[in-house]
Swiss-Prot record:
PANTHER family: RIBONUCLEASE H1 (PTHR10642:SF26). Belongs to the RNase H family. This is Ribonuclease H. Keywords: Cytoplasm, Endonuclease, Hydrolase, Magnesium, Metal-binding, Nuclease. Residues 1-142 form the RNase H type-1 domain. The gene is rnhA.
């Protein structure tokens, strides 16, 4: 099984507002940059979108390590919030509807195909590739305005 690393980030100007996302895929030292923009979105949607688009770009099942600065996503996966949400018919422990259900469901489909591990990185820190993703995601907002 091919081993791929994906660095991701999402950004939003105002929340909600225009947003950008970036995913950097690395396989055998070769980097591929994916990026996108949405007119009216949220930061969390852009974080999810970056991961989904990164996984969507893989042409066969892979062993993937996703690096993200989103505690929201890392906790939802690694602490199995997402499993609890599904059991509770996509409701939080406070009985409120989970936000971004459409994207969580899409992500779950890719998690069935790929062996994915999520790692939290500190945002706006010394992680070069996370910082690059952040810059690209923010640049998408500026370019599209």
């Amino acid at each position: 099984m091919k081993e791929v690393v994906i660095y991701t980030d999402g950004a939003c100007s105002k929340n909600p507002g225009p947003g950008g996302w970036c995913a950097i895929l690395i396989y055998k030292g070769i980097k591929k940059v994916l990026k996108g923009f949405e007119e009216n979105t949220t930061n969390n949607r852009m974080e999810l979108k970056a991961i989904i688009e990164g996984l969507k770009a893989l042409k066969e099942p892979c062993k993937v390590t996703v690096y993200t600065d989103s505690a929201y996503i890392v906790n939802a996966i690694n602490q199995n919030w997402i499993g609890k949400w599904q059991k509770n018919n996509w409701k939080t422990s406070e009985k409120e509807e989970v936000k971004n259900i459409d994207l969580w469901q899409e992500l779950l489909e890719f998690l069935k195909v790929h062996n994915v591990k999520f790692e939290k990185v500190k945002g706006h820190s010394t992680d070069t590739l996370n910082n690059m993703c952040d810059e690209i995601a923010r640049s998408m907002i500026k370019e599209m305005r």
